[in-house]
Amino acid sequence: MTNIRKSHPLFKIINDSLVDLPAPSNISSWWNFGSLLGICLGIQILTGLFLAMHYTSDTATAFQSVTHICRDVNYGWTLRYLHANGASMFFICLFLHVGRGLYYGSYIYTETWNVGILLLFAVMATAFMGYVLPWGQMSFWGATVITNLLSAIPYIGTNLVEWIWGGFSVDKATLTRFFAFHFLLPFIISALVVVHLLFLHETGSNNPTGIPSDMDMIPFHPYYTIKDMLGALTMILALLVLVLFSPDLLGDPDNYIPANPLNTPPHIKPEWYFLFAYAILRSIPNKLGGVLALVLSILILALMPLLHTSKQRSMMFRPLSQCLFWLLVADLLTLTWIGGQPVEHPFIIIGQLASILYFSLILILMPLVSIVENHLLKW
């Protein structure tokens, strides 16, 4: 008799994706982040669902409903902080996952990579709208500033912004639609995740060497299931430490002040995971130019397969490219720091230099250094 896991139509799909899936024998812990992102998504959907049961998307009661969740709902504070800090864990895993893809040349699988970029945009949109929901000062002003950027689009800009707002300012209509989209998007993300995995399983996983591993595969279970469980345990432990010891570490104190359209906070800034893009936006004095740079700072990832000039796939054996990669990481950390600083000297010039370096590294320096490495290896 055939094993039900291999004969049942539904179990067969799960078996081929999680149990009998052939995986390279040498993939390191950098390959753990896919499963960690799946766990993050699960945590966010579950905690979000329970929060939505108590939240009201009305400007008069939104702030109060979040206070009610924290004070009166059983373990409501846990749900709220798990959800808020879960988003931070989500982005930490996302950035590491994308960084792994850049370092080891995973972008050569263009379909998987492009769906991944779509996922990144979808998660960023979801996080932005979620930040607006508590209706604190930073929620309101963050929503006003970021949506207002669309007015830089020629001809249709102003109409587009008012259409998104549902009026002439960020108000009740905006909050209600943001809540609706914030609830809907994670399910769209889940569908995109399935497509992402579908494309990945067409080609199989890449590995640290970048050399095809068809001749040396091992079953996913038990080897990588146990490895993923260790990663999951580590991440959940880190999340719980954050939630139970310093839940407001990554938040903004201004968001504990109810939204007030008549009082602008001294420094409007988004959550930490958007600061690098925010710094790039602010470093260009022109509004439309800033918006284009903001979008391109993420969309530039789509050019990675075209900018790959090396004869080797991975950076594992390319020390010059490795140096530039870590320079890029340092540059992104610098941009993140600058995004959280006020717009004054010397932060303005540091931000502008870091932005120039960011685009130069990806578009010019890394492809050139790859060509140099090819010649050094006489390829």
Curated annotation (Swiss-Prot):
Keywords: Electron transport, Heme, Iron, Membrane, Metal-binding, Mitochondrion, Mitochondrion inner membrane, Respiratory chain, Transmembrane, Transmembrane helix, Transport, Ubiquinone
Binding positions (heme b b566): 97, 196
InterPro entries: Cyt_b/b6_C, Cyt_b/b6_C_sf, Cyt_b/b6_N, Cytb/b6-like_sf, Cytochrome_b, Cytochrome_b_C_euk/bac, Cytochrome_b_N_euk/bac, Di-haem_cyt_TM
Membrane topology: Multi-pass membrane protein
Transmembrane segments: 33-53, 77-98, 113-133, 178-198, 226-246, 288-308, 320-340, 347-367
Cofactor(s) this protein cannot do without: heme b
GO biological process: mitochondrial electron transport, ubiquinol to cytochrome c
Subunit field text: The cytochrome bc1 complex contains 11 subunits: 3 respiratory subunits (MT-CYB, CYC1 and UQCRFS1), 2 core proteins (UQCRC1 and UQCRC2) and 6 low-molecular weight proteins (UQCRH/QCR6, UQCRB/QCR7, UQCRQ/QCR8, UQCR10/QCR9, UQCR11/QCR10 and a cleavage product of UQCRFS1). This cytochrome bc1 complex then forms a dimer.
Alphabetical list of PANTHER family matching this protein: CYTOCHROME B (PTHR19271:SF16)
Similarity comment text for this entry: Belongs to the cytochrome b family.
Name of the protein described by the UniProt record: Cytochrome b
Gene (UniProt): MT-CYB
